[in-house]
Structures are given as C-alpha cells and as structure tokens.
Amino acid sequence: MKKALSLIAALALSVSLLAGCGGNGGTETAAETTVTESTSVQESASAENAESEEVSSAAETAAAETASEETQSQTETAAGEETAVNVMALKGPTAMGMVQLMDSAEAGPVGGNSYTFTIAASADEVTPKLVQGDADIAAVPANLASVLYNNTDGQVQVLAINTLGVLYIVENGDSIQSVSDLAGKTIYASGKGSTPEYALNYILSGNGIDPETDVTIEWKSEHSECVAALASDEDGIAMLPQPFVTTAQAQNENLRVALDLTKEWDALQADAETPSALLTGVVVVRTAFAEEHPEAVNAFLDSYKESVDYVNANVTDAAALIEKYDIVTAAVAEKALPYCNITFIEGTEMQEKLSGYLNVLYEQNPASVGGALPADDFYYIR
C-alpha cells in the first residue's frame, strides 16, 4: 500500500501530456474496450509456442504423428492456447498508435494473445493498475516509467518508445522564427513541475536564454487555459501539445505553429556521442509478466509495430478508428496525426534515446525520474 501511495504521489511530477493530448485537457471519462476471448482455432506461429509444457508436448506429438482424429484434437488444443494480455493507454498519441491492433483484436486473438484494452483519461488511473497487477502492459509518460521502476524496485520494464515530442510553440502572428526570438517574451504553458517545463528549460538554456530571467512563463493548470489566453492576447505565444494544437487552430485561424520543440531538441543533441530525443511516451510491461510470458510480450511488440506503421501510413482510415475508440474526433485526428510523432523504437536505440532523455530531466530535478536513473535492466531488449 505504501508503494502504491508513493507512486500516486509521484504522478504530480510526471507529465500528463498523453492524457492532455486527448483534446479535452483530461476531463473526459476513460473509454474502455474489451476484446473477448475467441474460441476459434488460431494457427499462428506465436500460438504454437504456448507456455504450458503439457500443451507444447501435445503440439509436438501432433506434428509427428499421422492425421488421426486424436492427433488433430491435440494439435488444435495447442494452437488454440492463448495468453490473456491486459493493455492500458492514455487518450492521445500513444492510444492512437494502438488503434489498428485494437480493431484487429475485436475479431479474436492476435498473434496468440487475447487482448483487453482500456483507454484511460489520466496517468493516475494507470499506475495503480500496474502496481496491483491488473494491467500487464501500459503506455505511460516516459519519465513516469522511470518513476515506476524506481518505486517498485524494478518491477516495471520499458518495451519501446511510442511517441516522440508533441510540444510546439504557437503564436498569434509571425514574430517567432527561432528559439532566440523568445527572449523577452511571455509564454503561456501548462505542465509546471513536469516534462513540459523541463523540456522548455533545456531548449531555452541551450539557446542562451535563461528561463528564470530572460522570458516570462505564465503557467496554467490546463491546456484550455493557454488557448483562452491566446484568444485574448493578440500577440500571445504558448507552448501546446498535439493534437491540442490542431484543436486550438480550429478555434483561432490566426494561430501559427512557430517552433517544433522536438526538432529544437534534436538540434541541441546533434553533436552528442549518443543523441537523446525529446520523448513523450513509452510502453512498459510488468517485469513478472515479461518473465512468465516472453513469447506473448514479443508477439505484442510485433503487432504494436504493425499498428503504428498502419496508423502513420493510412491517416484517414486510422482517424476513423481513433474516433471509434473515443480518443479524439476523426476530423481532429486526421489533421493532427502527421504532427503527433507516433513511432516505434525498441532495443538499443530505445535505450540510448530514453536514457539520454531521462538524464536531462534528472539533472534538472532528480524526483522527475524517481530519484535515480534506471539501471540497464529497466530496458527490455529482446
């Protein structure tokens, strides 16, 4: 219980961008979709690697024997064995990247996995589910993954990066052409004490601007307050995430995207030996689940990558699925998807980018990553 309470408290220091990107500032209720187990026989290669020794033995026997009725029955039992996987994601880009997999899973098991998906409005809905073992895999803010790892003694591992930076500087007008143009300006922003603040401070400092003295940052509690401030300030400048930028532009035709903070971060990292990246979200797994069901985890990664690739290559169709699962409307999703930086990065590249990113946050505020940088076992490398 103490662990769970400390984790929930740590959420105050973790970014809620993933939920905020849902277009309503985290005020909508969680949408849940449950995929029921299919009773039909699945003949995928992943299913044939079923975890039970008894089932594996039956499958091997069936493959070796002639096609008698008993042998066929044994083969069907082995092939039909499924692993139940509970997945949670937040309204926003990380959930957007899953929609093709979610849609496929409604028809039955995918790659030997029987999925239950839950879309949550905020990260504080996800954390207790992971801690209590009710969720096996979850899409969470990148720094929250580190907080979870540190506060559960390594009971969470990161599988992949699924969202790069979604933060943008927007303005009424065209006075901001580079980061240096922000000097002396007022910036409306939300997310103080979490990733947006640390990312903005890093980019400003890297361009010779002191965040404490050279700019004025007016921190708001929600993205919607930033939009309201822009509407009443004809020279207003704000830091907003996608797809909230797209929603704001629909309300204010004069609003212009001035800077992509992901690109500005990359520019500062260009000469680094192992460049990091501005990250928004990752997908994590309970360590115990990964150890017990490695085939299921790897099958999920394969299916999730296919889903991300589909979403990025089929924007219109993906937008319809995004609306189907009540993440954002299809109209907003179709315009925002090209700027949401939905991706799939695993393995050593994931470790390099994420570890560098966490180090930047740690140097500003150790509590933002759970008090310490994660050890190598934090990174799931298959």
Regions found by a protein language model. Name each.
Residues S355-R382:
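Conserved C-terminal helix/tail region of periplasmic/extracytoplasmic solute-binding proteins
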Residues T66, Q74-W219, G236, Q242, ...:
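Short, glycine-/small- and polar/acidic-enriched structural segments
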Residues K2-N24:
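Sec-dependent N-terminal signal peptides of Gram-positive bacterial secreted proteins and lipoproteins
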Residues A105-N113, K263-S276, I342-Q351:
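Short, solvent-exposed loop/beta-turn-alpha elements that line the ligand-binding surface or hinge
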